[in-house]
A protein has these predicted regions:
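Catalytic strand-loop segment that frames the active site of acyl-thioester-processing enzymes
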Residues: 23-52
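Hydrophobic residues positioned within well-ordered beta-strands of beta-sheet architectures
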Residues: 38, 85-87, 101, 126-128, ...
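Short structured motifs
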Residues: 22-26, 85-90, 113-115
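Short connector loops at helix/strand junctions that flank enzyme active sites
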Residues: 21-23, 33, 64, 82-86, ...
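Polybasic, low-complexity association/targeting segments
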Residues: 1-13
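Hydrophobic beta-strand-centered segment that forms part of the acyl-chain substrate-binding groove
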Residues: 69-108
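HotDog/MaoC-like acyl-thioester-processing domains
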Residues: 95-96, 106-157
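Active-site helix/loop of acyl-thioester processing domains in fatty-acid/polyketide metabolism
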Residues: 55-76
Length: 157
């Protein structure tokens, strides 16, 4: 499977299961072992100052981290429900045009801890980080705590 096909499949999944991602124009640029990169256009996310609305920027960061964790756990053969428990975003500069949310893969030791806890308890928590970038510049930094919970028998994702 090519990376482009995989990114298209991930994008389809997000648009189908998290419809706001389609309304915001979110595109999946990459989803691989190094992380997830989402891209969002200015137009559907614009505010009264002709820059990206802070809530849109935050939503794209939340989505990038969620996608990274979801597909990492899927690759490990885990069916889960993921919720965000808390998050913080620091805006460093206005976002005047299309932007990207870059969520790196979990470090190996964090992933091992997450998987061990999940297998033992049926739930686990981890911190995810995302950088928002515009024209090569980091414009915001996001941190969020996500909780993965094992699906109940018969429950679908």
């Amino acid at each position: 499977m090519t990376a482009l096909l995989k990114a298209a499949e991930v994008e389809h999944y997000l648009h189908r299961h998290i419809p706001i991602s389609a309304m915001m124009g979110v595109r999946v640029m990459a989803c691989d072992s190094t992380g997830v990169v989402l891209r969002a256009p200015l137009a559907p996310n614009i505010n009264h100052r002709a820059t990206v609305f802070g809530g849109s920027a935050s939503a794209v960061a939340i989505l990038a981290a969620w996608a990274q964790l979801h597909f990492t756990l899927r690759q490990a053969g885990i069916a889960e429900r993921i919720v965000i428990q808390r998050n913080q975003i620091e805006y460093l500069a206005p976002i005047p045009t299309d932007f990207e949310a870059v969520c790196p893969a979990l470090p190996a030791e964090a992933l091992a801890r997450l998987l061990k806890t999940f297998h033992r308890l049926g739930r686990a928590r981890t911190e995810m980080t995302v950088e928002l970038r515009c024209a090569g510049q980091v414009v915001a930094r996001f941190r969020g705590d996500y909780v993965a919970v094992r699906l109940a028998a018969g429950e679908n994702v």
